[in-house]
C-alpha cells in the first residue's frame, strides 16, 4: 500500500517536472500518473448504503464487528443515512447493547457538526425505530447537558 502511494507521488512529481527539471515529461508519463489514480470501480451512494445495511443486518454480527463497522463508517467524511443507522441500531438490539446504540446516536450528532438541521432530521426518520426498540436519544437521557 505504501509502495503504491510512493509510486503515485513519484509519478505525479515526475509529471510536474520536480524530479528531473531539465527534461519535460512525456505525454505517456502524464497519462500513466492519471491512470494510477483511476483504478478500481467507484461505488454509488446506493451501493454504499446497501453495503453498510447488509453489514449491520448480518444475523451473526458480534459486538466487535458492530464497533469495527461503526468505527470505519465514522471515519468517512459523511453523516450516515438513516437506513444505515437503523440497521446499526437493530444490530445493537440483537446484541442487547444499549450503550452502543446511544453512542451511535451521539456519533451521528457529532458527525453532523455545525449543520444543525441534519441531526433532528435523522432522529425524525429514526423515531419509529427508536420507539420500537426502546432506545432513548442522548437528549432524552440528559447526556447533552454533561
From Swiss-Prot:
- Which domain of life does this protein belong to? Eukaryota
Where's the motif SIFI-degron? 2-16
Tell me the InterPro entries matching this sequence: Cyt_c_oxidase_su5A/6 (IPR003204), Cyt_c_oxidase_su5A/6_sf (IPR036545)
Q: Name one Pfam family in it.
A: COX5A
Q: Which residues carry this modification: Phosphothreonine?
A: 137
Where is this protein's transit peptide? 1-37
This protein's UniProt keywords: Acetylation, Heme, Iron, Membrane, Metal-binding, Mitochondrion, Mitochondrion inner membrane, Phosphoprotein, Transit peptide, Ubl conjugation
What protein name is recorded for this chain?
Cytochrome c oxidase subunit 5A, mitochondrial
| Species for this entry | Mus musculus
Amino acid at each position: 500500500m505504501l509502495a503504491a502511494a510512493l509510486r503515485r507521488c513519484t509519478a505525479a512529481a515526475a509529471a510536474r517536472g520536480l524530479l528531473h527539471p531539465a527534461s519535460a515529461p512525456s505525454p505517456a508519463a502524464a497519462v500513466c500518473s492519471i491512470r494510477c489514480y483511476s483504478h478500481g470501480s467507484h461505488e454509488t451512494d446506493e451501493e454504499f448504503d446497501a453495503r453498510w445495511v447488509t453489514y449491520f443486518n448480518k444475523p451473526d454480527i458480534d459486538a466487535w464487528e458492530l464497533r469495527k463497522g461503526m468505527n470505519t463508517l465514522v471515519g468517512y467524511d459523511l453523516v450516515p443515512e438513516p437506513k444505515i443507522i437503523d440497521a446499526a441500531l437493530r444490530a445493537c438490539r440483537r446484541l442487547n447493547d444499549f450503550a452502543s446504540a446511544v453512542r451511535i446516536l451521539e456519533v451521528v450528532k457529532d458527525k453532523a457538526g455545525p449543520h444543525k438541521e441534519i441531526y433532528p432530521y435523522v432522529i425524525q426518520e429514526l423515531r419509529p425505530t427508536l420507539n420500537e426498540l426502546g432506545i432513548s436519544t442522548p437528549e432524552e437521557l440528559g447526556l447533552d447537558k454533561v
